């Protein structure tokens, strides 16, 4: 069974893989000679895994003193921030439950609880789900609490802000595709709130999804960002520790049949295999189903690392994604020029609302959007660097070919 040799990754990347395997799964690991620890620190930041990478920094004598002090300060500040965000989960829980609104968090503390130490998971904002029937009532409730709502035209959530709290209230998880597969996924999620599980720890009290719902939500979220800007190692770590908490064959029994029906089982297998090959997740037989799976899992890992967390390492990837897919909603099999043209139309309608009211003016909107792109690119040339649409189109080809191998939202009958 052919795998992408770990030596295909550079020393900095291999070091991060080894440290992650040590932190997440207790694997024995000794760094190779000549590691540039400043580069490791920077790359772990790009991947949003500094906490997991340096959780055991005291066991690494080669880290320079100045960098070690920087690491200590970062770990202390990051864990304090994470503890605060766990507390915000409790705040949301208390507010909603005291007012009779059933809900479930999405990811967040629900992902952190699978880590050996939940504080080592880099936390973002608080995402949670309420039903469409309760949505307006919940919105009014947060308004009375002093939150400002924005993004009401978003496809699946509203943003709620009251400094320093940042919330995303969903009426639908991100990444649900169009068509019959999307309808089946929504049927899977119809009892999301009813099946939610209480999470009570030293850090938080909230309602989290059951294992099946959590895995499904993560897979949709992962493909949603993978096809666009990229996911980075943080998301792979979330997936790996989740898979690791199942007993042997329990994961397969829980997920295989239902995920095959919506075309996500192959993604689940190959993500798990990537984590097993490179960051220490114990491998199980269900992770491989084809002699080429090891090679595909390696290619997937190369892609994950290349993008960084939400494309932090390569801003052009988001533009490449416009030629690959509409974040998976219509699959990844379309012609890239057709995808790019579709993306231009979606962006134009969003940025120039008059084109929705008067469709004949859509070409005028195209001009406005393209002029805006040229203006922003001019400014980037002076600051962060040029983003080439032609280069994005060219590089999108290899990525699309890889993603087609994942069979996203293509049911396995």
Q: Residue ranges of each PLM-predicted region?
A:
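Conserved NTP-donor binding/palm subdomain of two-metal-ion nucleotidyltransferases/polymerases, i.e.
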Residues: 2-124, 130-413
